[in-house]
Amino acid sequence: MKDELESIDAAGAVLLWRASEYYPERRAQIDDTPACITARGNLHLLTQPMIAIVGARNASINAQRHVHNIASELGKHGYIIVSGMACGIDAEAHCRALDTGTIGVIAGGIDIVCRPENADLFEEVASRGLLLAEMPPATKPTPKHFSIRNRVIASLAVGVVVAEAAHRSGSLITAREAATRGSDVMAVPGSLLDPRSDGCKQLIHHGATLLQNEADVIECVSRQPAVRIPPEQFEWTDSMRQTIDQTAVGRCAKN
């Protein structure tokens, strides 16, 4: 434990215990979450309402444009943007929220840059936002760690926006976990001809809120009381569960 704490300190990070002032409140209410999480950056962001934006690595231009607008609008309304530090949708969401607040959840250790092409973004989020990691320092991510990362994202946010996701996207894990926790699940429908949107269409078919523009997101998360999708109404079929869970041992590592 001493070595781990020294590594955390060397990375410019801190260890947040469940009893800590800054330990995320929504996460603290979940019984099976670990007692601590590593953080590097502006801890105050953890006290603000958060919305997750997730989606495809190989995102379409239209999806990136939607994310640009959604992240910007949510920032203006005081929401912190949470995403997974991957390429594509994640990177776009983080970039557009640097000025208003963004949290990047890492699949590996707090000192591990998963994708070299995101090294600059990694440091930008650390200095202007916040990085979180559930794994110990020096942990290089494996496929199962990406599944864990997606669950962490879902545990932080009051709502999840899936901007673009294929049939077997790891983003569907985030959506499933959010629905299980009673959070808003929202999805951009995308083109009927683009397989990168097939996962979003599934989510909408099974009860997620259809998003046509950024105003729809604000309306959805601003309802008093907030309208959530109860897990029992989020009708996952056995085939959907099997497909989504397979990402943890397959393509999830690419997300």
Protein language model features and the residues they cover:
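Glycine-biased, small-residue-rich flexible motifs in mid-sequence functional cores and linkers
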Residues: 6-255
